[in-house]
Amino acid sequence: MKNNNNKSSSSSSYDSSLSPSSSSSSHQNWLSFSLSNNNNNFNSSSNPNLTSSTSDHHHPHPSHLSLFQAFSTSPVERQDGSPGVSPSDATAVLSVYPGGPKLENFLGGGASTTTTRPMQQVQSLGGVVFSSDLQPPLHPPSAAEIYDSELKSIAASFLGNYSGGHSSEVSSVHKQQPNPLAVSEASPTPKKNVESFGQRTSIYRGVTRHRWTGRYEAHLWDNSCRREGQSRKGRQVYLGGYDKEDKAARAYDLAALKYWGPTTTTNFPISNYESELEEMKHMTRQEFVASLRRKSSGFSRGASMYRGVTRHHQHGRWQARIGRVAGNKDLYLGTFSTQEEAAEAYDIAAIKFRGLNAVTNFDISRYDVKSIASCNLPVGGLMPKPSPATAAADKTVDLSPSDSPSLTTPSLTFNVATPVNDHGGTFYHTGIPIKPDPADHYWSNIFGFQANPKAEMRPLANFGSDLHNPSPGYAIMPVMQEGENNFGGSFVGSDGYNNHSAASNPVSAIPLSSTTTMSNGNEGYGGNINWINNNISSSYQTAKSNLSVLHTPVFGLE
């Protein structure tokens, strides 16, 4: 009983020391720090917001330097064995201040509130005491105590001990006072699954999916060779691009069977490739790989189903080519209107250069292999090669005055090619001179001379043909003898020009040339003579290989 009286007397003396001089007057609140780290718990009768207190007392406890130890959920044991204040009680204690603790109160620069408070308004927040009227501290607080109080207030904001708008105000204090020990609660963003380099893009062996086009490509690693400066033995062989994955897998299987035989590992059973195994026996590795590429959907534009045939990208016609012959990388065989004709041209060239082992588009039994092998032409007369006897292109025939004593004034120079016919004779194209001035005679307008009774009409035909019965298509034109023209000069007759021709066939051979020069200063007509070159006949070629006669069309004859 005596002990209780002593307690009440000490409590009343403590309350009287903390009471303000005038509770109704407005005055400035000021901040004071506790001298120790003891938690002061007060009676709920002095403050209705306090949830649980029986008597005013304080109990000492050691200072906590940790963030979360001060706000542990386990109650703090008092000295007398009664449980301490729970975190919910601390929330109720902090709700005394409707505005919550502000930065101005810590720094002392802001205006204080003038709200009339009850007599006892002392709160303990992590060692910081808010009071309306307290005695000045006996000594200034240490730096460790200030730092500890700040850490506890910041930790209280993280743990949600402030209610409502109080937590937002404390968080603003936390932003202005950064804490290096604050724990970030932001969850890490999940990383995207990125395909690693070298990851398989197909379930089949030797097949990869192109990352841009989306097509499937088949590749084979040929380890039978090693290039210079290459660390890894072998090379990658491209087998083509395909729209379907299984087609690319079949291409790999066929190439693997060709390279390594039937014991290799394939995507599909070997029994599916019985016909292909027979075909690949007659091909080399390079040829078989080329055939696989041509069958792929990713082959170059204008591809044909036949070997050695491509489509021209401009005019759309089909071209035939054969590779790696006669030291050439690519030999052009011609342009054709259909794929089949171009394929036959390739087959003939392949038989010519590679014999019976040639890979052809059609069955080799349809071709006469012996005649093709003995023929000098690679494509059966479609592409004639000039022989050494006929290879004298752009040959110049110069008729100077020294050739004949009667040729004194004119000088005719013809640049012509001299093809040879089947009978060994030489034939020439004929250029026709035309006088531009009008004349009464029709033939004078055509052939450019006046009527001459001494002129002899002779047929213009090829050597070895019937001159008296010319075939249709041959032109009959008058040929002037030497010295019988009206130009004031002399032309070359049959005797002076064709020295190698037969004497019984005195046929004129005035050649048609792309370049014809005539120098004559004494012309009977008083005008210039124009030579019309018939270039149509020079580009005309017969379809049959045994006919090499080039007909000269004469316009104006019906």
Swiss-Prot record:
Q: What is its main location?
A: nucleus
Gene Ontology cellular-component terms for this entry are: nucleus
Biased-composition ranges, Low complexity, are: 1-54
Could you tell me which SUPFAM superfamilies the record lists for this protein? DNA-binding domain (SSF54171)
Sorted alphabetically, the keyword list is: Activator, DNA-binding, Ethylene signaling pathway, Nucleus, Repeat, Transcription, Transcription regulation
Q: Which residues bind DNA?
A: 203-269, 305-363
| Region of interest called Disordered, as start-end residue ranges on this chain | 1-65, 74-93, 166-195, 387-406
The record's annotation in Pfam families points to: AP2 (PF00847)
Would I find Transcription regulation among this entry's keywords?
A: yes
- At the top level, the lineage of the source is Eukaryota
One Gene Ontology term of the biological-process aspect is: leaf phyllotactic patterning
Say what the protein does. Probably acts as a transcriptional activator. Binds to the GCC-box pathogenesis-related promoter element. May be involved in the regulation of gene expression by stress factors and by components of stress signal transduction pathways. Involved in the regulation of floral organs size.
Family membership noted in the UniProt record: Belongs to the AP2/ERF transcription factor family. AP2 subfamily.
Protein's name according to its UniProt entry: AP2-like ethylene-responsive transcription factor AIL5
